[in-house]
Design a protein with these regions (language model features):
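Bacterial N-terminal signal peptides
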Residues: 31-40
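Sec/Tat signal peptide C-region and signal peptidase I cleavage site
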Residues: 41-45
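Bacterial N-terminal signal peptides that target proteins for export
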Residues: 5, 18-31
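The feature marks the mature, well-folded catalytic cores of soluble enzymes
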Residues: 46-442
Length: 490
């Protein structure tokens, strides 16, 4: 007998369920002991409580699945006025796409399964695409009040029903508005065509976060980026992942401000994430850690808009920080403070334990060695690297010899990624990735599955979402991990 687990993503036998339950209970007991010691006090041990589900307990664990988006036509409108597009400078759209594809290839060579937004949009049901496109295609008839609104809407729906998959995707990414006016010539209509394309979608770090408990859909600080979350939500649905929370109302949350760190969650509060967003996360028990450290940014500078632009983690006892923050003195805008929230093991409600603590001191008290990132390297996005395994990072190429030496002295393997065009969008290797799962202990494989129509399973090396080897072939079409690689069954 095969039973579908609650997450809807994997199938295991009854015997496997009993084995999994037993091992899970052991992990829970270990977690309770570790959390009791660490969550309400500063812990130097840096235990990495690693979830059986593969959700990242810590930034330094081996990456298994990553969601990315290779930019396309939607990028052009952003580069013709970079500031309005939330970009730093003009950059070549075609070169940027080429760089992004190269980055994906480098990740895949490390055994990472990369899921792209465009591939997912090419796979989902066309009705799902039509729902998204319906929200984005606008007929503006305000300039012709004598036109019947119901007739105009019926015409719009008729066009949407006829649209091909490719054109529905263009509607979703370009967000077109047709501003209509009347004329006596030709068809009787003229139009001004306006686009509000999702030029920042390639920064897939920001629309969601992945905590030890699961996935959270963010509420973006910039209104022009708000529609991106609907696309990412659809991607999660297609991958068989159900987000546990969506930030709403006045709450603001962007993924670049969140870093899981073993027994604690680090969350930045500043330009893009606010206290209300953090409150919603804690109230919903979405962090999955008994200690939450709110890192307060007092500088509010675009170049350091998120926590991951000035602080990052390489291993359980090694991190980086830009020199201006590392060396800042109390009272200077670069000086980060942090508030530490904690709760008793087994309880839900957090309480403020310590407030306005020096962030650098806190990090060092937890046993981290800090590699400084000097100004010139910071301006080249050196701190915005992606950790794909302990002391193994993907970082923007072209950094100083001094920084290269610092990494080498710390035993860090660095793969230098050519991202010269893409970084002019105000982000780099970390910003362009959303790590959906990181491997658990041992040699298990964590893999995201894709919802599919019918199965064609030819390999017995199949794994469930929690990384457990399945005996024989999966019995259903919506779970299929072939030798650790996602297979899309059409």
């Amino acid at each position: 007998m095969h039973t579908k687990l609650k997450n809807g993503a994997c199938f295991v036998t009854e015997a496997e369920k009993k084995e999994l339950k037993s091992s899970t209970m052991k992990r829970v007991m270990i977690w309770l002991i570790a959390t009791f010691v660490c969550s309400a006090s500063v812990c130097n041990a840096q235990q990495g409580d690693e979830s059986a589900m593969g959700y990242p307990q810590a930034e330094w664990l081996r990456a298994g699945d990553i969601l990315m988006h290779t930019p396309g036509q939607e990028l052009f409108n952003g580069v013709i006025h970079p500031a309005a597009g939330l970009f730093e400078d003009y950059f070549d759209v075609d070169k940027a796409a080429e760089e992004h594809r190269g980055y994906i290839e480098m990740l895949q060579k490390n055994g990472i399964r990369v899921h792209t937004v465009r591939d997912i949009l090419d796979e989902v049901g066309i009705d799902s695409l039509r729902v998204l496109a319906d929200n984005e295609l606008i007929y503006d008839i305000s300039g012709i009040p004598d036109v019947d609104a119901d007739e105009s809407e019926a015409y719009r729906q008729e066009v949407l029903q006829k649209m091909s998959r490719g054109d529905l995707i263009r509607c979703i990414l370009l967000q077109p508005t047709v501003k209509l006016s009347k004329t006596d010539n030709n068809t009787g209509y003229e139009a001004q065509y306006i686009q509000n394309p999702l030029m920042n979608l390639y920064f897939t770090r920001d629309q969601s976060i992945t905590t030890p408990r699961g996935h959270v859909i963010c509420n973006m600080n910039s209104s022009q980026r708000a529609p991106e979350t609907s696309i990412i939500s659809l991607c999660y649905e297609h991958l068989g992942l159900k987000p546990i929370l969506r930030i709403e109302g006045d709450g603001r949350l962007e993924g670049g401000d969140y870093i899981p760190a073993g027994t604690v969650s680090l969350i930045g509060c500043g330009m893009r994430t606010n206290d209300e967003g953090i409150r919603q996360l804690m109230e919903a028990d979405a962090f999955g850690h008994d200690t939450v450290v709110v890192v307060r940014d007092h500088k509010l500078w675009q170049m350091q808009m998120h926590l991951d632009t000035y602080f990052n983690i390489i291993d359980r006892n090694l991190c980086t920080m830009v020199s201006s923050r590392l060396n800042a003195q109390l009272g200077e805008p670069e000086f980060n403070t942090c508030d530490i929230w904690a709760r008793k093991p087994g309880t839900k409600e957090y309480a403020l334990w310590k407030q306005d603590q020096p962030f650098v001191e806190y990090i060092r008290s937890r046993g981290f060695e800090i590699i400084p990132i000097d100004y010139d390297d910071e301006m080249h996005y050196a701190n915005n690297f992606l950790t794909i395994a302990p002391r193994h990072i993907m970082a923007v190429g072209g950094q100083s010899e001094e920084l290269q030496r610092r990494f080498a002295d710390a035993g860090v393997t660095v793969e230098w990624v050519p991202l010269e065009s893409l970084i002019d969008g105000y982000g780099a290797a970390h910003c362009m990735t959303q790590v959906l799962q990181r491997e658990t202990t041992g040699d298990t494989v964590s893999a995201i599955v894709s919802t599919a129509n019918d199965a064609n399973v030819t390999d017995t090396k199949a794994y469930s979402l929690d990384g457990r080897r399945l005996q024989g072939k999966p019995s259903c079409a919506d779970v299929y991990i072939d030798n650790g690689i996602k297979v899309v069954n059409k």
